[in-house]
């Protein structure tokens, strides 16, 4: 614990304090649940600022393998802004990542990107958050491709497939998402090998689809359309802007763009991280 100024105290933010941190993301209108906070704080490291017994600022760093760590949840309560809290916590998160010998990555909001650029973060690719209301029709899988429910026994093969295409070692993230929403988890196979997969999770305001990783746009569309065919209520998905065909299909079925993100890194990104060609949906800006 370290005193900053006045009533502000900086201290570690731990999984046991997830419920106390949740109002920060809820106030910002973000989609994370207490379960999401708890997972990220258990798997990664958090730092926060408290005032009068409540959390008024946060930042997290989630390791995604030996080379990469994802910074997220850089939040400051509205009534505590303009006191340097966000900048301080971002610096602390960057230091945590560097001390571990990793490269820092993040998905910046349109408002956040100008804040990150002076720190040395550089753009990789643009992403759009799309919101879809209600179901959409399921599309056929390409010839030779079969889609079935993803089971826990599939995680080693799915994790290896994902790492080779996302440059992220995030098997704990995949296992968490499978546990949160097993009914959404699907795997596509062709010639006895993984050709794609999709996972999802319930959020505070909408169900989030992702990650969606596939060998082709056709496989990705078959996977995501099956999830949407069973949708009840609002669904969100974060799609790299490069995937025009998927975006066109989603737009045709009522998708509305909510906001944009920019994937960024501080330092040289791991090989493949800047390649969005097989990343059709993010796990979310907080999970990579």
PLM features: what roles do these ranges have?
Residues 103-107, 122-136, 257-269:
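Conserved catalytic-core motifs of GNAT/GCN5-like acyltransferases
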Residues 116-117, 121, 250:
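Conserved active-site tyrosine of GNAT-family acetyltransferases
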Residues 1-7, 14-19, 39, 50-52, ...:
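Intrinsically disordered, low-complexity, positively biased terminal segments
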Residues 90-96, 105-107, 112, 120:
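A generic, well-ordered mixed alpha/beta core segment in the N-terminal half of proteins
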Residues 124, 129-156, 160-162:
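Surface-exposed beta-loop interaction hotspot
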């Amino acid at each position: 614990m370290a005193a900053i100024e006045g009533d502000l105290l900086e201290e570690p933010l731990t999984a046991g304090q997830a419920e106390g941190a949740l109002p920060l993301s809820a106030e910002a209108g973000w989609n994370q649940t207490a379960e999401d906070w708890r997972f990220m704080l258990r798997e990664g490291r958090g730092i926060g600022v408290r005032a009068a017994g409540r959390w008024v600022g946060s930042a997290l760093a989630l390791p995604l393998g030996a080379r990469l760590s994802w910074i997220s949840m850089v939040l400051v309560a509205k009534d505590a802004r303009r006191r340097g809290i966000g900048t301080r916590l971002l610096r602390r998160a960057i230091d945590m990542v560097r001390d571990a010998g990793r490269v820092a990555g993040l998905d910046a909001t349109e408002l956040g990107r100008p804040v990150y650029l002076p720190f040395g973060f550089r753009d990789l690719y643009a992403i759009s958050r799309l919101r879809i209301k209600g179901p959409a029709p399921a599309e056929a899988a390409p010839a030779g491709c079969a889609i079935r429910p993803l089971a826990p026994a599939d995680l080693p093969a799915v994790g290896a497939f994902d790492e080779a295409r996302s440059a992220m070692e995030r098997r704990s993230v995949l296992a968490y998402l499978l546990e949160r929403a097993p009914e959404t988890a699907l795997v596509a196979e062709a010639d006895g090998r993984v050709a794609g997969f999709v996972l999802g999770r319930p959020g505070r305001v909408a169900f989030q689809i992702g990650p969606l990783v596939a060998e082709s746009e056709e496989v990705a569309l078959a996977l995501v359309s099956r999830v949407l065919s069973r949708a009840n209520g609002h669904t969100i998905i974060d799609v790299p802007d490069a995937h025009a065909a998927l975006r066109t299909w989603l737009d045709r079925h009522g998708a509305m763009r909510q906001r944009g993100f920019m994937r960024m890194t501080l330092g040289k990104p791991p090989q493949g991280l800047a390649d969005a060609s097989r990343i059709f949906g993010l796990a979310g800006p907080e999970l990579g």
